[in-house]
């Protein structure tokens, strides 16, 4: 990629945002060296890798990458024999611990069923160095001090030091507490000078204590003297400290040699953890932007759905759909300056650069991107003072370079093409330059304010005009991209809104050719038509989504209902069988007892009486079990099905009406308010409803059958309520009721709305209304039946 392209598209600013999500200098180094790739397979793998990390972030919210350091230089020094400091060794141990934790973290997620093949491959390369890690942390404390436990010798030496220090302090404190000391000492304290314990003695009492003078105060009135009585003790203390230093250095050197022995493994682990830090930084950045993984294709087209510029506040940015490479390979965005054309241009460029860098991009899911070998951008004022080039010349130097290199694998972005010179000549140059790159097969997005290019897309294949919508009421751009609609200046409308008189505006219109006016009016109508079409499409799309959601929910509820019904039937059947089995066992026991009594001649019981008793006991078996054992074969001839027939859908156990045959073996069936495809093999014919023969209808019910004039649903769950409404309306129609009432209460209104939505689609409902004041008001729906 050209450095200039990366600069004008602000690629480095994206990297600066990405840097904020790294956990270590290792990851930061990777980000700083990040560049877009041009290899298709590599880009696909990078996108998949970022997607796996994003999945981990969704599952866990974070990745345990704390405590990771760039220890590469320390490890290399250890290899050549340099002794590492305690803090350097602690950094190595901390990084080894972090690597081990990261490995276990990913493996645990995989063990729980997540599919992370790429991350799993990464962490598989991490080699645990637990023993070395523990050896370092066992010898060095969190503050960087070598611990007494590092060796027995060090513990013994430090015990000697503590004993010597205690004896010295004891002697000196005794001296400072004596009555004579009060007048000879500047202060009754024990202090240290040159690593030796001393007391502050007044100048005039210098000879009282003897010993060695190590320092004096700024005034010279106080001498810091090591009394003669502790000189030997101080000497012993110094010797012990020298031994301590030697032992500490020996321990550090020993640990350094341990690190050197595992240097290659440590460095390999560092490289893996650096990659993981970089990968998870990309995932966290994607989460921050609400970015998604684009589909990468090699068909040389892109489809960015609701694309946003990553560097603009998402609260103010207007997302746009941008398609390039399918029906058209060149987009020319026309219209006035400050209309958001450059933002659209930069959005395309930066999204491509990010995608080819393995970053997710700020677009909706299912967006597609292709791989470009070169991305060229001529954006902004690149005037060179040193070369004394004008704005036009500066742009032209860049355009000449682009024309030398652009080919069918290039994306070319032109901002205000042909600007900075005579408008007529600039427009002519712009058209010629666009023709050149377009004919080479490059993908091109260009912006211009020249009116001559408004018709550019109408007489060339695979070229389309576009514009950025402008609201003349607010005198500001909406930043909404209108594909297929060229831009217009809006100068007259803006001037009118700002108070310019109609007389002046009308005279200005007369100076414009009739053709130009026609074009402007045509563009205005196109803009209005496109806005209306988009609004209608959004409304239709929203209704479609709601319908699909309702359809899925109803299907789920029906399936759950039938599963619950079957489960209860099976449970009841099992309980019945258990009771029957218990009765049979009891019968067998009674029969055995009677036979034993007969053998013992204590009872005169005949065999036929035993058989009769057993038959009576078997006759007590519940009907459910008996019916299950009897399989009745349906020998009725198969009914020829027609639209309008009522059938029973066996899978759901529900009654439905045939709507339309959609294949040799499938029908569209209306089950309540739900429409679905059902196979003929899953239906059972019920009847064909007669057409409008209401007078001849007679309903026969059993003596005890009664249908109430009202149905009370208060306290019912929504699903149960809907099933009760369906059955109640069927029963009310069979009873020839002209009107019924459904009591749903007021509450939150959810049940009321559900009931009325159901009534709208019920074929037996003529009309419905809320109840009057005496009927229950909003808590009741009165239904008129057909």
UniProtKB/Swiss-Prot annotation:
Superkingdom of origin organism: Bacteria
Entry EC number(s): 3.1.-.-, 3.6.4.-
Alphabetized UniProt keyword annotations: ATP-binding, DNA-binding, Endonuclease, Hydrolase, Nuclease, Nucleotide-binding, RNA-binding, rRNA-binding
InterPro entries associated with the record: DNA_mismatch_repair_MutS_C (IPR000432), DNA_mismatch_repair_MutS_core (IPR007696), DNA_mismatch_repair_MutS_sf (IPR036187), MSSS (IPR046893), MutS (IPR045076), MutS2 (IPR005747), P-loop_NTPase (IPR027417), Smr_dom (IPR002625)
CDD domains found in the cross-reference section: ABC_MutS2, ATP-synt_Fo_b
Binding site for ATP: 335-342
Any one GO molecular-function label of the UniProt entry: rRNA binding
Root EC class: hydrolase
GO biological process: mismatch repair; negative regulation of DNA recombination; rescue of stalled ribosome
Domain Smr: 711-786
Record-linked Pfam families: MSSS (PF20297), MutS_V (PF00488), Smr (PF01713)
Record family assignment: Belongs to the DNA mismatch repair MutS family. MutS2 subfamily.
PANTHER family: OS10G0509000 PROTEIN, OS10G0509000 PROTEIN-RELATED
Purpose of the protein: Endonuclease that is involved in the suppression of homologous recombination and thus may have a key role in the control of bacterial genetic diversity. Acts as a ribosome collision sensor, splitting the ribosome into its 2 subunits. Detects stalled/collided 70S ribosomes which it binds and splits by an ATP-hydrolysis driven conformational change. Acts upstream of the ribosome quality control system (RQC), a ribosome-associated complex that mediates the extraction of incompletely synthesized nascent chains from stalled ribosomes and their subsequent degradation. Probably generates substrates for RQC.
Assembly and interaction partners: Homodimer. Binds to stalled ribosomes, contacting rRNA.
Protein name per Swiss-Prot or TrEMBL: Endonuclease MutS2
Organism of derivation: Bacillus cytotoxicus (strain DSM 22905 / CIP 110041 / 391-98 / NVH 391-98)
Name of the encoding gene: mutS2
């Amino acid at each position: 990629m050209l450095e200039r392209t990366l600069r004008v598209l602000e690629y480095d600013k994206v990297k600066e945002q990405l840097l904020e999500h790294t956990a270590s200098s290792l990851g930061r180094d990777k980000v700083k060296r990040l560049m877009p790739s041009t290899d298709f397979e590599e880009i696909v793998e990078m996108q998949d890798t970022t997607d796996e990390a994003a999945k981990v972030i969704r599952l866990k919210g974070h990745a345990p990458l704390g405590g990771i350091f760039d220890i590469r230089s320390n490890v290399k020094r250890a290899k050549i024999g340099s002794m590492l400091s305690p803090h350097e060794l602690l950094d190595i141990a901390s990084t080894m611990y972090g690597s081990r934790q990261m490995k276990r973290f990913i493996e645990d997620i995989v063990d729980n069923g997540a599919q992370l093949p790429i991350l799993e491959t990464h962490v598989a390369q991490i080699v645990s160095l637990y023993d070395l890690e523990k050896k370092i942390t066992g010898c060095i404390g969190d503050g960087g001090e070598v611990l007494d436990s590092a060796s027995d010798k060090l513990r013994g030496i430090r015990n000697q030091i503590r004993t010597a220090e205690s004896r010295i302090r004891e002697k000196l404190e005794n001296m400072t507490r004596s009555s004579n000391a009060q007048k000879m000492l500047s202060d009754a304290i024990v202090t240290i000078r040159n690593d030796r314990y001393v007391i502050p003695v007044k100048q005039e009492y210098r000879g009282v204590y003897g010993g060695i003078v190590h320092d004096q105060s700024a005034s010279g009135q106080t001498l810091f003297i090591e009394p003669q009585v502790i000189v030997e003790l101080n000497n012993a203390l110094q010797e012990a400290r020298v031994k301590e230093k030697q032992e500490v250095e020996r321990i550090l050197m020993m640990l350094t040699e341990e690190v050197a022995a595992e240097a290659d493994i440590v460095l390999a682990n560092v490289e893996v953890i650096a990659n993981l830090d970089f990968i998870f930084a990309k995932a966290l950045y994607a989460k921050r932007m609400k970015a998604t993984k684009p589909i990468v294709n090699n068909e040389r087209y892109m489809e960015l759905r609701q694309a946003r510029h990553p560097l603009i506040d998402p609260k103010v940015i207007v997302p746009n759909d941008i398609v390039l490479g399918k029906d058209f390979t060149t987009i020319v965005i026309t219209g006035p300056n400050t209309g958001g054309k450059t933002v659209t241009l930069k959005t395309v460029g930066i999204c491509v650069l990010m995608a080819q860098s393995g970053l997710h991009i700020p677009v909706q899911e299912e967006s597609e991107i292709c791989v470009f070998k070169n991305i060229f951008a001529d954006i902004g004022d690149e005037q060179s003072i040193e070369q004394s080039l004008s704005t036009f010349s500066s742009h032209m130097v860049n355009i000449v370079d682009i024309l030398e290199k652009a080919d069918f694998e290039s994306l070319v972005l032109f901002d205000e093409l042909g600007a900075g010179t005579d408008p007529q000549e600039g427009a002519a140059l712009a058209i010629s330059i666009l023709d050149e790159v377009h004919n080479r097969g490059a993908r091109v997005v260009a912006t211009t304010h020249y009116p001559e290019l408004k018709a550019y897309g109408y007489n060339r294949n695979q070229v389309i005009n576009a514009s950025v919508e402008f609201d003349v009421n607010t005198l500001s751009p909406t930043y909404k991209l209108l594909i297929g609609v060229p831009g217009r200046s809006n100068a007259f409308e803006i001037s009118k809104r700002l108070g310019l008189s109609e007389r002046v505006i009308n005279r200005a219109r007369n100076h414009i050719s009739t053709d130009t006016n026609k074009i402007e009016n045509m563009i205005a109508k196109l803009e209005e038509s496109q806005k209306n079409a988009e609004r209608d499409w959004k409304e239709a799309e929203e209704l479609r989504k709601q319908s699909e959601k309702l359809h899925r929910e109803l299907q789920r509820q029906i399936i759950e209902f039938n599963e619950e019904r079957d489960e209860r039937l099976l449970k009841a059947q099992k309980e019945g069988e258990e009771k029957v089995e218990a009765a049979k066992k009891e019968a067998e026991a009674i029969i055995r007892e009677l036979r034993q009594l007969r053998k013992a001649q204590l009872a005169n019981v005949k065999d036929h009486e035993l058989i009769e008793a057993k038959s009576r006991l078997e006759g007590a078996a519940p009907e459910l079990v008996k019916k299950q054992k009897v399989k009745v074969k349906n020998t009725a001839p198969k009914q020829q099905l027609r639209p309008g027939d009522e059938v029973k859908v066996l899978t759901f156990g529900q009654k439905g009406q045939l709507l339309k045959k959609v294949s040799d073996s499938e029908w569209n069936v209306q089950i309540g308010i739900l429409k679905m495809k059902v196979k003929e093999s899953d239906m059972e014919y019920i009847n064909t409803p007669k057409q409008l023969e209401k007078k001849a209808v007679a309903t026969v019910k059993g003596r005890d059958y009664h249908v109430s004039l009202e149905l009370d649903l208060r306290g019912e769950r929504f699903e149960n309520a809907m099933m009760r409404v369906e059955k109640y309306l069927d029963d009310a129609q069979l009873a020839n009721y002209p009107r019924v009432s459904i009591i749903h209460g007021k509450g939150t209104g959810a049940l009321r709305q559900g009931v009325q939505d159901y009534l709208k689609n019920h074929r037996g409902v003529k009309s419905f209304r809320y109840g009057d004041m005496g009927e229950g008001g909003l808590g009741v729906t009165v239904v008129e039946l057909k």
